[in-house]
C-alpha cells in the first residue's frame, strides 16, 4: 500500500515570511500539529510544530525543578518573551531538518521513517519537493489495526 492512499491532502501551509502571530493562531487555535513552510512555488522549506515555538519561549525542562532552579520562569515571563519575539517569522523558527515521504512510498517505509526519526507526522512531497499532504503515524496504526485485523489474527496463530 502506498502513502497516497492514507495521506491527508491539502495541508494548511505558511510561507517563509508568515509572522509569528499567525503561526501561533494556526497551531494554537486551529489545533494543527504541524505547519509546512513553503516557498512561492509551494516547495517544502521546513516545518513548524508547537514544540518549535515553545523551544524559543520555555527554558529547558530541567530548569523547572525548583531545587535546581529556584527562580523558574512564570507564565508572565513567558508572555513577556512572546512579546519580544513578535518580529519573528516562519523562516526564523522553522525546523529545516525535515524528513519527508513521497506519495508512492510504501506505507511501511513511511512508518519506519516516522519511528526511526521519532516524529509522528511526515510531510508528503512530489519529486520537485512541492507539498502534497502529510502522513500521520496514528492513521497508519488505525489502518493496520482496523483494516488489517486478519493479518494480526494470523500473527497470533504463528506465535502459538
Say what each PLM segment does.
Residues 14, 28-31, 52, 61, ...:
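Residue-level detector of secondary-structure transition/capping positions
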Amino acid at each position: 500500500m502506498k502513502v497516497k492512499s492514507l495521506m491527508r491532502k491539502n495541508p494548511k501551509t505558511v510561507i517563509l515570511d508568515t509572522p509569528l502571530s499567525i503561526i501561533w493562531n494556526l497551531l494554537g487555535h486551529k489545533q494543527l500539529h504541524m505547519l509546512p513552510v513553503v516557498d512561492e512555488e509551494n516547495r517544502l522549506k521546513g516545518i513548524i510544530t508547537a514544540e518549535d515555538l515553545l523551544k524559543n519561549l520555555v527554558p529547558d525542562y530541567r530548569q523547572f525543578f525548583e531545587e535546581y532552579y529556584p527562580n523558574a520562569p512564570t507564565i508572565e515571563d513567558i508572555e513577556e518573551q512572546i512579546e519580544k519575539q513578535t518580529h519573528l517569522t516562519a523562516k526564523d523558527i522553522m525546523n529545516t531538518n525535515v524528513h519527508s515521504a513521497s506519495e508512492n512510498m510504501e506505507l511501511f517505509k513511511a512508518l519506519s521513517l516516522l519511528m526511526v526519526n521519532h516524529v509522528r507526522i511526515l510531510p508528503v512531497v512530489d519529486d520537485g519537493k512541492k507539498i502534497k499532504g502529510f502522513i500521520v503515524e496514528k492513521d497508519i496504526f488505525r489502518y493496520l489495526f482496523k483494516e488489517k485485523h486478519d493479518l494480526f489474527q494470523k500473527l497470533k496463530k504463528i506465535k502459538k
